[in-house]
UniProtKB/Swiss-Prot annotation:
This is Bifunctional purine biosynthesis protein PurH. The keyword Calcium does not apply. Keywords: Hydrolase, Multifunctional enzyme, Purine biosynthesis, Transferase. It catalyses: (6R)-10-formyltetrahydrofolate + 5-amino-1-(5-phospho-beta-D-ribosyl)imidazole-4-carboxamide = 5-formamido-1-(5-phospho-D-ribosyl)imidazole-4-carboxamide + (6S)-5,6,7,8-tetrahydrofolate; IMP + H2O = 5-formamido-1-(5-phospho-D-ribosyl)imidazole-4-carboxamide. GO terms for biological process: 'de novo' IMP biosynthetic process. The keyword Repeat does not apply. It comes from Trichlorobacter lovleyi (strain ATCC BAA-1151 / DSM 17278 / SZ).
């Protein structure tokens, strides 16, 4: 290991850079820098040599050319143990650079702004930064490269232990991180620009890059014979399972993560009142609204208490002690919510295996992004199903108008139905599911299962269907069970027949003109 004697520092994110530079100066490291970074370091009392002085060539083209010079890249790429390299460097007056500290122009943050123009995006594509990073990473045996402020402290600790040097093992790890970082950076640029090919700026790009980082290894996958790991996307701010914090409990399983995702996404549908959902195998087995988390949970569990055993529970409100006591009175795999009060957390400790997950507060976050479905050899890419039509905005197709109470129930049922596997049929009142039929190959069978599962009275409830009724038999079955109103997308060639069935039974029927298939 050779002692670091010269470092080139040029960063957009200046977190921790002054402290790092002062520590390097303490080891006698010469600091090269550019632009705003050099200005900041000088203002902090450090001696800095401009890169233009080091290369003998000025910055030009509005700062587009600063470090793209043989004296920079020769100093990074020259192999210290290669005599020919060293001779050529000496011949051309190239001095070695032992450390590079660089992070890149904030392209992703720039294009995330609603008023970002193509020119704005182009000007935030870093050229010199990735080039230096890649040069340093290629010659990682001789050069330490830092692209993440989170690594500054560890490198300084190693330098302290090794007389100002960094090990080859650490340099290799940091180099790998560089290539992961530049791949993600280029992928973001490619995705954003690629979506703007042609006249339609909303086209999907010809090539699509997704960069994810491993959050944790999992014991196994969906089944014990499958290996698995959990990866998360970069820069996620929306409250979701991927940025949830585990406060206690056993290690998350593959199936836990999928069900936690289903739970938190379901309760996001409800903002006006406390909501609770109980999930089994990604399907809701009970959803309810209440005046408090505990009242919502008790009503959700009432729908199907047998299936609720061993389930995963999601809330849209902070969980209090009363809810925690009830949750710990039975066996549950996990709970996910936007927070817990101190007493609730203390109660959960009595059930140390229960996984308690916290997401950021649900209000005020924009829901965006793609939905990816894996097929063998490929990916299907689509926008997430974030659409929702309120029952009051639906078109009434029946002779009878729905009552205000029915409209409230239809709205609740439609929001729940969106999160049930197709074919999906849901019976509800205004704030509680009564029967849920999920995942059947025929819609009428889903209706029959919803009736069979119902422990609460179906008479006077409403029905939601995630897609149109292909025949009137589903409506007839619902009427026989006591349903008074139906919400569905419409769009069948037999819509008139289905509407006529509703009229014959005196039911109200509204069309959403929006389908919510879920596979």
């Amino acid at each position: 290991m050779a002692k670091i004697t010269r470092a080139l520092i040029s960063v957009s994110d200046k977190t921790g850079i002054v402290e790092l530079s002062k520590a390097l100066a303490g080891y006698g490291v010469e600091i090269l820098s550019t632009g705003g970074t050099a200005k900041l370091l000088r203002e902090s009392g450090l001696t800095v040599k401009d890169v233009s002085e080091f290369t003998g060539f000025p910055e030009m083209l509005d700062g587009r050319v600063k470090t793209l010079h043989p004296k920079v890249h020769g100093g990074l790429l020259g192999i210290r143990a290669n005599a020919e390299h060293q001779a050529k460097m000496k011949e051309h007056g190239i001095e070695p650079i032992d450390m590079v500290v660089v992070n890149l122009y904030p392209f992703e943050a720039t294009v995330a702004k609603p008023d970002c123009t193509l020119e704005d995006a182009i000007e935030n594509i870093d050229i010199g930064g990735p080039t230096m990073l890649r040069s340093a990473a290629k010659n990682n045996h001789d050069v330490t490269v830092l692209v993440d402020a989170a690594d500054y402290a560890a490198v300084l600790e190693e330098m302290a232990a090794n007389g100002g040097a960094v090990s080859a093992k650490t340099n290799f790890r940091l180099a790998v991180k560089v290539y992961q970082h530049t791949a993600a950076y280029d992928g973001a640029i490619s995705n954003w620009l690629g979506a703007r090919l042609g006249e339609n700026t909303d086209e999907y790009p010809e090539t699509f890059t997704i960069q994810v980082k491993k959050a944790q290894d999992l014991r196994y996958g969906e089944n014990p014979h499958q290996s698995a790991a959990f990866y998360v996307e970069r820069g996620i701010t929306e409250p979701c399972v991927s940025n949830a914090v585990q406060l206690q409990g056993k290690e998350l399983s593959f199936n836990n993560i999928i069900d936690l995702d289903a739970a938190i996404e379901t309760v996001k549908e409800f903002t006006d009142k406390p909501a609770a959902v109980i999930i089994k195998h990604t399907n809701p087995c009970g959803v309810a609204l209440g005046d408090s988390p505990i009242s919502a949970y008790l009503k959700a569990r009432e729908c199907d208490p047998v299936s609720a055993f061993g389930g995963i529970v999601g809330f849209n409100r902070i969980v209090d002690a009363a809810a925690a006591r009830e949750l710990t009175s039975t066996f549950l795999e996990a709970v996910i919510a936007p927070g817990y009060d101190e007493e609730a957390l203390a109660i959960f400790t009595a059930k140390k295996n229960v996984r308690v997950m916290q997401v950021p507060l649900l209000a005020g976050h924009l829901q965006t992004g793609y939905d990816l479905k894996r097929v063998v050899g490929g990916l299907l890419l689509q926008g997430r199903d974030l659409g929702m039509v309120a029952a009051t905005d639906c078109k009434v197709m029946s002779e009878r108008q729905p009552t205000a109470q029915e409209l409230a129930a239809l709205d609740f049922a439609w929001r729940v139905c969106k999160h049930v596997k197709s074919n999906a049929i849901v019976f509800t009142n205004a704030d509680q599911t009564v029967g849920i039929g999920a995942g059947q190959m025929s819609r009428v069978d889903s209706s029959k299962i919803a009736v069979q599962k119902a422990l609460l009275p179906i008479k006077g409830t409403v029905l939601a269907s995630d897609a149109f009724f292909p025949f009137r038999d589903g409506v007839d079955a619902a009427a026989e069970a006591g349903v008074t109103a139906i919400i569905q997308p419409g769009g069948s060639v037999r819509d008139e027949e289905v509407i006529q069935a509703a009229n014959e039974h005196g039911m109200a029927m509204v069309f959403t003109n929006m389908r919510h298939f879920r596979h």
